[in-house]
Amino acid sequence: MRILLTGGSGFIGSHAAEAMLGRGWEVWCAVRRTSSRRFLGDSRLHLLETDFEDEAAMEAALQSLRFDAVVHAAGATKCVRKSDFHRHNTLLTARLVSVLQRLALRDGASECESRLPRFVFLSSLSAINSIEGEALGKPTAYGASKREAEKIVEACRLPWVILRPTGVYGPRERDYLMMVQTLCRHIDFAAGFSPQHITFVYVTDVVQAIMRAVEGKAEDVTGHIFTLSDGETYTSRDFSRLIAGELSALKGSRHRVLRVTAPLFVLRAVCRCGDIFMRVTGKAVTLNNDKYNILSQRDWRCDISASRRLLGFRPEVKLAEGVRRTVRWYRQNGWI
């Protein structure tokens, strides 16, 4: 099977590339000239350098290749300007879909729909502003850009599958790394006094879903949006407690932490400072006003029953084991 993968230099994409190569697939990874190659060193991987901002350049890079499936995992999770989310997440998706449709039609795929490559789009739970009819809170620029990208995918002629993972963690992930680093400094910080229900999914389980979306029977998977989590609901303290426990295991003695709970306005102030820093330096940071709307949301519960039933999704890594693997990887690779 020949696959086009975008976002292969990123957290989820690099894990997906490894799994695809392990399956014996021919993987073509579309990368920017400036993309890191740190996790793309496997000699079996075909790197396809292109400019995602230039539709003509994308078409030129892809015109001689034909793919069985396209996995679109590229995008931005933090940006200096909110408009950049639209540019990196929505417009990039629109260009890619446009190029793929045009090339497929040029090859006569309009006469044989089975020749159209399956398009698997990695979205986010943030793309929706309600779960089971309940308002999630203020929408984010990131989530809005992902939802607009979903609409583009839903309207295209390609057979599509959309995946909406909740909070994804695991080796190579950098946002949750901040929390681990804070706990390494013996501080367990939480914002907001009302209970917060959160969900997680380990990176290899997201990759499992990607593989199933590529390989699944068309009548079961195409034209569907699948939510991904490990099937459990946690609190933020559950997550920090497991991290502290793993830090204790690594050092061979109890890793003591000071629990600090601050009002949400403190987190808001920190995130506003992050916005000011971004405007001054031009560098994106994790804590910003858009991220505040995600962090302050108190309920991220989700239903994965359709993913189990139609996609055959079976989350294998629960939070305790996932945290153990992640923290040990951070330590072994000098990230903490």
Predicted feature residues:
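N-terminal Rossmann NAD(P)H-binding glycine-rich loop of SDR-like oxidoreductase domains
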Residues: 3-23
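NAD(P)H-binding glycine-rich loop region in Rossmannoid oxidoreductase-like domains
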Residues: 50-95, 125-134
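Conserved Rossmann-fold NAD(P)-dependent oxidoreductase catalytic core, especially the SDR/UDP-sugar
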Residues: 94-141, 161
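Conserved beta-loop-beta element that borders a ligand/cofactor-binding pocket
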Residues: 150-171
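Substrate-positioning beta->alpha
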Residues: 174-178, 192-215, 223-227, 236-241
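Conserved C-terminal active-site "lid" loop/helix of NAD(P)H-dependent oxidoreductases
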Residues: 203, 225, 270-314
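Mid/C-terminal beta-alpha module of Rossmann-like enzyme folds, strongest
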Residues: 216-286, 320, 324-325
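Amphipathic terminal alpha-helices
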Residues: 302-310, 314-336
